[in-house]
Amino acid sequence: MILTIDIGNSNIDLAYFNGNKIVSHYEFETKKFSTSYEYALIIEWTLKREKLQEKDILGVALSSVVPSLTSAFIDAIKYLFGKPPFVVEPGIKTGISIETENPKEVGADLICNVVAITEEYGHCGIAVDFGTATTFSVVEKKKFLGAAIAPGVGTSAFALFEKTAKLPQVDIKAPESSLGKNTISAIQAGIVYGFAGLVDGILERQIKELKYKPVLVSTGGWAKRIVPYTKYLKEKDIDPYLTLKGLYYLYLKNL
């Protein structure tokens, strides 16, 4: 059994792999001031839920975009399993050529996503990750060509609430019409249909710059709320575990 842990800005995803299949998945809120002891307790709790012991885990893979938590998790994993995890960081084997100005600054989540695309979906693809940020990662012929990064759906909605005096926080869902008849439906229309337009606009530009027709795969917590209203993305191509799959494949490449 392989344990994979993906630390994001909003959530921490944890999955157990048996072979190349996810047998269980857990999601926790990211708390940036928690200690390694607290995270060790969380991991230990998932082990008990799965009726597993530490000796059943052959390896642990860690991806993080929150530097302050990376060391806490490394210490927690060392404490539980007696050895450090594999960490997605510059210098690891990816099987992908990073064609950017500074490969070392490419986020671990973007690397995981393009590796998963290459391993599971084909030689050319775009991963759209609807997280705290909305990212568009492009891979073609095992080359990471670049990315686009936009604010996340929830991030934008919260900023609208925080920076305005009279606009309320709303449940982010698509209203019946883009013509909002009240403040709540107007905000919902702006966020949902606005992000759908943002996604289509970026994808249209990226697709034109590629030599081959890309596979389009979406992931992230906001995907199900936005994808149905886009032109390019399909609900059937939402892969909620894309980043974790990429992390698993990276672990195997670095054994």
Curated annotation (Swiss-Prot):
Co-factor binding details: A monovalent cation. Ammonium or potassium.
Function noted in UniProt: Catalyzes the phosphorylation of pantothenate (Pan), the first step in CoA biosynthesis.
Annotated pathway: Cofactor biosynthesis; coenzyme A biosynthesis; CoA from (R)-pantothenate: step 1/5
Keyword entries, A-Z: ATP-binding, Coenzyme A biosynthesis, Cytoplasm, Kinase, Metal-binding, Nucleotide-binding, Potassium, Transferase
Subunit structure: Homodimer.
Required cofactor names: NH4(+); K(+)
Protein name from the UniProt record: Type III pantothenate kinase
Active site: residue positions: 109 (proton acceptor)
